[in-house]
Every structure is written in C-alpha cells, then in structure tokens.
Design a protein with these regions (language model features):
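Hydrophobic residues on conserved beta-strands that form the core of alpha/beta folds
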Residues: 3, 70, 136, 148, ...
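Conserved GNAT acetyl-CoA-binding A-motif
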Residues: 94-106, 228-235
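Conserved beta-strand in the GNAT
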Residues: 52, 58-74, 183, 189-206
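C-terminal "cap" of GNAT-fold acetyltransferases
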Residues: 100, 104-111, 116-117, 123-147, ...
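Conserved GNAT-fold acetyl-CoA-binding loop/helix
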Residues: 16-42, 150-178
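Conserved acetyl-CoA-binding loop-helix of GNAT-fold acetyltransferases
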Residues: 81-94, 112, 116, 213-227
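A short, internal acetyl-CoA/4′-phosphopantetheine-binding micro-motif in the GNAT/acyltransferase core
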Residues: 69-80, 103-104, 205-212
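A short beta-loop-alpha structural element at the N-terminal edge
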Residues: 1-16, 145-158
Length: 235
C-alpha cells in the first residue's frame, strides 16, 4: 500500500479500476451512465487522499476518503475475493477513523460486504447524488473504536486537556461555562476535547500528545461540522 507513480498516472489507473469494477458489479447501470460518471470519478481521484494496494508494480485496488467518510472503494475484478477490500476498509477505520460510506442499494454484493464489516443503514434516498434513479444507502459503522461525547457534568474535570490548547486557566474560565464541550473517547479513555461557544467559534481543541499526528484532530473537526451543520454556516 504505497505510491510508486506520479499522481497523474495513479489517477488514470484508478479510473481504469473504477470502470472495470463497475462493469463487473453494477449490472444495473447502462453504458451512458458509465460515460456520465467517469468525469466525477476522475475529479474525486484527483482531489481525495487515496490508499493504494499494489500487486507487484500494479495498482489493483484503491480507497478514497474525505475526513471520516469512505468515498470510493474499488478492486480489480481479477483480485476480488482475496481480502484486499477488507484490508483497505480496516485500515480506513483504524487509521483515518472512517465511520460512514454510501453504497448503491442495487449493488447487493457491496451492501452485504459493508454489513459484514460492521456498517448499518442510517438512511436511504431514492436517487443518487446526481439525481439518477439509483437508490443510495447511507451506512454508518455500528461500533467505531472512538466516539465523541458531550460533557454534561464538570467541564473542569478535563482541565489538563484544556490547558494543552489554552495555557491560561483564567482565559478558559471566560468561555467554558457557557459553551458546549465534547470529549473524544478511545477504548474507554479520554484522548481529546473540543469547546464551541454560542456563536459557533471553536474556543479550545486538544488531543493528548501520544495521540497527536494520528488524525484525531480531523476526527473532532468532522464531528463538530456534522453536529452543528443545521445551526451554524461555518465554525
């Protein structure tokens, strides 16, 4: 799972993989659909972080993600059934803390695969994101290894974390009481926190030193964006 080529070559190969995989698994699509979706797939391959699986010098599978959402997962039809897709999903769950994915309802193999990986249906739409009549299932991981919890008790119990981001306790006291506070738990341990005031400003965000550089800050921001999406236009 490494990059051996320049980005343009990687994108071209991933688009090829997408088309080969779709032709093998999406029998509900017509030829015009593949032509329609190809530019969108190329755009996603260009802009999203990609995890690549190589066999020798050849890319045979890839996963694209955006924050904590798995946006793409495609495996060369010749390499299906070898556990490559499972490996990519497990990496995404563990290393980028992925928790959501959208899948075509008519792609029964994919629906069953994600169910085995621990995802469950959160909602359904009759059309896809382009308005085409292909129902989409939006899935969420049932038991992710980490979770965000809103603090309803003593917020100062997490002062050691708050002071990592804002070393002046008097300053923390100015905003803490009237703000929302959340803690990030991993395996039963609090490893991070975030404080958001009544105007939607993030006043404090911290992750324990031993968990820094592991995308937990991104996870917190992704959670906050979802939590406040109907209340604030931006944070």
């Amino acid at each position: 799972m490494k990059e051996k080529r320049n980005r343009a070559e990687i994108v071209e190969r991933c688009v090829e993989l997408w088309e080969a995989s779709v032709r093998a698994t999406h029998d509900f699509l017509v030829e015009g659909d593949i032509e329609f979706y190809r530019p969108f797939v190329r755009e996603n391959c260009e802009k999203l972080p990609l995890l690549l699986h190589y066999e020798g010098d050849e890319i045979v599978a890839f996963l694209g993600y955006d924050m904590t959402s798995i946006e793409m997962l495609f495996v060369d039809p010749d390499y299906r059934g070898k556990g490559i897709g499972r490996d990519l999903i497990e990496w995404a769950i563990e290393d980028v803390h992925a928790e959501t994915v959208a899948v075509n309802e008519q792609n029964g193999q994919a629906v069953s695969f994600y169910a085995r990986m621990g995802f469950e249906v959160e909602r359904r739409t009759e059309t896809d994101g382009c308005g085409k009549p292909y129902p989409i299932l939006y899935l969420r991981l049932k038991n992710p290894p980490q979770r965000m919890v809103k603090v309803t008790g003593d917020k100062k119990a997490y002062l050691h974390l708050l002071l990592d981001a804002d070393p002046c306790e008097a300053m923390v006291d100015r905003y803490l009481e009237e703000s929302d506070m959340f803690v990030l738990e991993r395996d039963g341990k609090v490893i991070g926190e975030a404080v958001v005031d009544e105007k939607g400003e993030i006043k404090n965000l911290a992750v324990l030193p031993e968990y820094q550089g592991k995308l937990y800050g991104m996870y917190i921001l992704s959670f906050l964006a979802g939590y406040y999406k109907d209340r604030f236009s931006c944070l």
